[in-house]
A protein has these predicted regions:
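Conserved ABC ATPase signature
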Residues: 134-138, 142
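Helix-to-loop junction immediately C-terminal to a conserved catalytic motif
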Residues: 48
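The feature captures the beta-strand-to-loop junction immediately N-terminal to the Walker
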Residues: 33-35
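Catalytic Walker B motif of ABC-type/P-loop ATPase nucleotide-binding domains
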Residues: 159-163
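Conserved ABC ATPase "signature" region
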Residues: 97, 112-130
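Conserved catalytic motifs of ABC-family nucleotide-binding domains
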Residues: 155
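Conserved ABC transporter NBD signature motif
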Residues: 56-64, 73
């Protein structure tokens, strides 16, 4: 689905990505983990065409990403940023309708098929009942479901999410990841999600990529990546890892630096 080969990107003098290579298979749920500033968000921005890589190549379905038009990329890859800003008077329906922009010509009005796609996306994310509510008056968890619905309205093959549960309480965190897991399992949607919550990533992702200082440190199964030695080295923090008594997936616990 996605092949990243020797990708590098820099913000002026600061190297954000350095020689990143990664294969993402169709239908997998890949979690991107790593410390702040390790390049996770920059990698997502390169994958959706927002940032052009300085070196290296990204292949989407076997074709160089740079050979797609902006519309072509948007019809295949949807991005859910960490923070989304909308006009205060937008309804939830109007926000999701923005996801149909890649399929419309300039000044073209939305067609019946576009409205059908919006309803389907909102029903899939269980936010159809919010369609007439203003985006500013709904809760954080509800707003995140609306933003994900907007991405799904693009009918993408790949969904990218940058910390989709940031600023949410544990109930809404679980709600968002249950939704993503369902989209991945039942519909085969390929998902790449940046997460600072290692335990949520462990429970819902099928594979993990650990980043450090702009590079891919390790890629593999959750039980191969979420191990004390590797996490201690990358995060510079002692951790304890134990299988969840409920699911058996590895869970990471902070070891306090108490004297």
């Amino acid at each position: 689905m996605i092949s990243i080969k020797g990708l590098s990107y820099s913000y002026f003098e600061r190297q954000a990505l350095e020689d990143v290579s990664l294969e993402v298979q169709a239908g997998e749920f890949l979690g991107l983990i790593g410390p702040n500033g390790s390049g996770k968000s920059t990698l997502l921005k390169c994958l959706c065409g927002i940032l052009p890589p300085r070196r290296g190549e990204i292949l989407l379905e076997g074709k160089p990403l740079k050979d797609y038009s902006r519309r072509g990329v948007a019809q295949r890859v949807a991005m859910v940023p960490q923070d989304s800003t909308f006009g205060l008077n937008f309804t939830a329906y109007e926000v999701v309708l923005l996801g149909r922009t890649p399929y419309l010509e300039r000044m073209q009005l939305e067609r019946t098929s576009d409205h059908e796609a919006v309803q389907k996306a909102m029903e899939r994310t269980d936010c159809w009942d919010l369609k007439e509510r203003r985006i500013w008056e709904i809760s954080g968890g509800e707003r995140q479901r609306v933003v994900i619905a907007r991405a799904l309205a693009q009918a993408p093959r790949v969904l990218l999410l940058d910390e989709p549960t940031a600023h949410l309480d544990i109930a809404h965190q679980a709600e968002v990841y249950e939704l993503l897991g369902s989209l991945n399992r039942q519909e085969g949607l390929t998902i790449l999600a940046v997460s600072h919550d290692l335990n949520l990533a462990s429970e819902y992702c099928t594979r993990l990529a650990l980043m450090e200082k702009g590079r891919i440190k390790a890629v593999g199964g959750k039980k191969d990546i979420l191990v004390p030695g590797l996490l201690n080295e990358v995060y510079k923090q002692e951790v304890f890892v134990q299988a969840s008594p409920v699911t058996g997936e590895p869970h990471v616990f902070l070891v306090p630096k108490r004297k």
